[in-house]
């Protein structure tokens, strides 16, 4: 501190340091503000520049603000100048690698510094860069730290990120590697600042150098995810995510956010991403070939960041991940082996970074896989929000799948390329749409992101993309067992994705595209379902059609799935419990429905093929949606999808019916799957597929209460079917709010079970009951396997059990229902039995909801609406899909049970009516009883009041009448009537009241008396007061004073004064003086006492002033002299006579 402070003090930077410190505080505040979980869709980019202007006036502002704004807008050019301006790191390309790494480290150090203010420490390891960057870097840090996420990110991160974008390999590496390293290292290092910085330095260098492409993706995602986490979540959580260092993370989270955001160049990147968003799809494709995964990821992330400015935070995580994932999936699909290799390097390099930057589940997970899994686990556990990190241990286990997946990858590579094209098309398009959707869904993801399911979601998305990545990423997974572990971590969530990706990869490279289209798109589809449903129904159809075509394609992939089935089976090997993957089974349901929807598309063949493929394709299919559900996002999205799909169903015109059916069927399957996934959290947790899905949901539920949010989102989204048009936004809002609510209410243990109960009820609605018998044990066993996640999500596990049962039994049913008709039957069974199970699931729900009356009521109505949704979805989805009576039967049972069940079967619904009825009863009773009581009490009070004056009769009569009437108006009327009657009858009582008032009147009299006494005091003797109280006191005092005034002008005051002296000397009785006064003006001395009143009266009228004087004289002949003398005459008492006479004569003369 001292050295740097001295150096800076000697040089210009010391103000910068001060400014930076100030900015540090501001940055902390800003970071917290940005942590707005509400999801500042108003881009931090937009917001922070204002803060920058305020905070960073001066070097930082000029450098950083222009840099941040420019770099945000121009990003690459601006960022480079920013680096130059900030740290002279203008060399973004290779120089950035060294310089930005140092610079980022320095930034981290500076961020750390503002927080720690450990210039020496930071300087120690960062000093060399700092020396160069130090003055400027102070600004970068100030900027960086100050803008916290936006500006510093923009200048430094934007520079670095611009480097990421412009020199995406190195800059990303540097910006990223540093950001992740710094973020990863620095967050931890931030805890250990000194250690941190050197660590980040050394760390960054390898990472930046080693990870160049991937670190970009990972750090980018890391930063963004963390940033999102940080922004959306408290910096502490973000850092918890980042570092898992909850303690240090608080401050570092900001810094990390700053570092991440900055490293991510979030705002800049976001803005750049805005521009790049436009570019990024192209860049995506170019980058895809480019395999600048980081670039693509950056671009995509930027693209998504574009949206991110809107949903920047959530979108950051999602978008970063999404584009990263999508780009990564495209790039990774194209380059994945390389990137996978890079990813392993990343894993190796990112090990640290991942360990530290564990928040980025994608990268962190790979790192985790490498060595950091434990650390990641710690971090993840610490940053439990990042479930993926938690999952990495699982991932460490699941690597098998990923390892197996590489075979898939080998097989899938062509498929991946195909999927690549598709993914690039669908992923890129979908990514774009997804990005678009992401913004809205990212908003939803904001909630999720808040919960960090988004990370999982994003990771799932990444995994979705990674399924492509997983396809290629199986190589990546091979290399990135970390990422495969991430995928396992993701497998927690991404297991699904990876299974989805794997299954997807297996069956759906096409189907993965379906899954990507669906998974990637469903996130987009879900998201796009939001958007797509709204805007992209065709795309959703495309996704669904894609799904349909992929269904065929899935059949073709089924051949691939033959291989992929091996991979799938291998994946199920991992997902062995769910080899019939619960998800797979729901997929059969979904696929059944989808297959039914895609019936024309070789529905039976597809289903059979999918099911034959171990229903892996179907699981893939279903996993896509279920992954969607499994994904935090997807959980919400399935809900959204439900609503959106229902929306689609509502918007059947919007979506072609095939799409509608597909989307609706998918929506049903997805919502249902989502429900099972949500409910199947435990279930999914149970098996890798389930684990994939549920771990993310369930883990989400545990650490994040995201499962609750997810379930809540699902249930709420389902619940929100009523607001289906609003659903995208409501889900987004609801997703956010509800997830926060879920966090708020969902965090409450009761809430998760309730929502999970709802979810489980709904998943139960799907296959819950069908699955219930056998899968319970299976589901429980897998759940036990998933027990690590399960403990926190025990409620979810219960729901998961049902959902597992649902999924497992559905798998059985799906397996049994290999054929389309059989699928229909399971579909039909699903609605029917799940309805009963819904009832079962909802008794707990009812109880829980009863505990949670309002939330429960919401859930119940939502459940009802969801049932209606399911009805509608099942009807529309199944009817077209099944096209057979079963769908109608399903429809009929669903309507009766959803209608009836929501009320009858849905005990929650029954509870709701009952609750509502009790409320109504309470309200009615309360209204009636309170009204009666209130009326009586009021009437009684009124009566009591009136009774006291009015008498007992009024009370009795009033009470009797009031009791008979029991109504205020009548009671009041009676009271009034009785009151008047009582008053008329007992006016004496009223008089008594008056008497009591008389008491107060006596007080008034006392007041008057006091006033009179006051006046009397000036007036003079009490004797005269008795005689002349009223007239004299009132008239004489005022008139006398006035007369005296007139006399003063009229006559010499000196005389009055001399009179005062004389008066005092002569001091005679006032009475005499008054009489004499009156006599003098009036002339009648004989009337002295008796005529005191007469004298004033008589002379008063005749002698205008004299009477006034005489009047004044009578009361105060002194008052006349009393103007000056009166008070004194009172003292003198007598002496008024001569003086008064003298005064009077003089006054008379004067007046005359």
UniProtKB/Swiss-Prot annotation:
Residues 248-545 are annotated as: 17 X 14 AA tandem repeats. One of its GO terms (cellular component) is cilium. The modification Phosphothreonine is found at residues 282, 354, 380, 442, 521, 526, 571, 585, 687, 942. Phosphorylated at serine residues in K-X-G-S motifs by MAP/microtubule affinity-regulating kinase (MARK1 or MARK2), causing detachment from microtubules, and their disassembly. Phosphorylation on Ser-787 negatively regulates MAP4 activity to promote microtubule assembly. Disulfide bonds: none annotated. Residues 53-67, 371-384, 644-653, 769-786, 839-848 have a biased composition (Basic and acidic residues). Residues 68-81, 654-666, 680-689, 704-725, 911-929, 1142-1152 have a biased composition (Polar residues). The modification Phosphoserine is found at residues 5, 14, 60, 99, 253, 280, 358, 384, 440, 507, 510, 580, 624, 636, 643, 696, 713, 723, 787, 797, 825, 827, 853, 928, 941, 1000, 1073, 1145, 1151. Residues 50-100, 362-401, 641-991, 1074-1152 are annotated as: Disordered. There is a cross-link at residue 838 (Glycyl lysine isopeptide (Lys-Gly) (interchain with G-Cter in SUMO2)). Changing residue 696 to E: No change in microtubule binding; no change in microtubule polymerization activity. Non-neuronal microtubule-associated protein. Promotes microtubule assembly. Interacts with SEPTIN2; this interaction impedes tubulin-binding. Interacts with TRAF3IP1. Interacts with KNSTRN. This is Microtubule-associated protein 4. It comes from Homo sapiens (Human).
